[in-house]
Amino acid sequence: MGALEPSWCLLFLPVLLTVGGLSPVQAQSDTFPRCDCSSVSPGVLAGIVLGDLVLTLLIALAVYSLGRLVSRGQGTAEGTRKQHIAETESPYQELQGQRPEVYSDLNTQRQYYR
């Protein structure tokens, strides 16, 4: 543990200010002028948090219900379409027996590569 990390230095800052004759509150008030802003009461803060949770749950519920509706609609149409394709077409080509004329020219060209 050779050198102190920056987070440890921040922990020692109030101690250094107190030893130097300044309390952390005095140092802050001298550096930054007092703000005349309105403070947020705990009730308002709790209302914001609860409202956020309710809206998040409503959005999740809406996405879930829409996802179920879309997958149901596509699932039935897709299933009948797949059955229709399976009845009309085969994805595999039938074997057509041996055709020696396809490979007959390979034997004639082989002598050039020797």
Swiss-Prot record:
Ca(2+) binds at residue 52. One of its GO terms (cellular component) is cell surface. The chain crosses the membrane at residues 43-63. Residues 22-42 are extracellular. It comes from the Eukaryota. The keyword Nuclease does not apply. Residues 74-107 are annotated as: Disordered. Changing residue 103 to F: Abolishes phosphorylation and ability to regulate cytoskeletal organization. One of its GO terms (biological process) is semaphorin-plexin signaling pathway. It is a single-pass type I membrane protein. The record marks 56 as: Important for interaction with transmembrane receptors. Residues 1-21 form the signal peptide. Expressed on microglia (at protein level). Expressed on oligodendrocytes (at protein level). Expressed on macrophages and osteoclasts. Expressed on dendritic cells in liver, spleen, kidney and lung with highest levels in liver dendritic cells. Tyrosine phosphorylated. Following ligand binding by associated receptors, tyrosine phosphorylated in the ITAM domain which leads to activation of additional tyrosine kinases and subsequent cell activation. Residues 64-114 are cytoplasmic. Keywords: Calcium, Cell membrane, Disulfide bond, Immunity, Membrane, Metal-binding, Phosphoprotein, Signal, Transmembrane, Transmembrane helix. Residues 81-109 form the ITAM domain. Induction: Induced in microglia following nerve injury (at protein level). Induced in liver dendritic cells by physiological concentrations of lipopolysaccharide. PANTHER family: TYRO PROTEIN TYROSINE KINASE-BINDING PROTEIN. This is TYRO protein tyrosine kinase-binding protein. It comes from Mus musculus. The lineage of its organism: Eukaryota, Metazoa, Chordata, Craniata, Vertebrata.
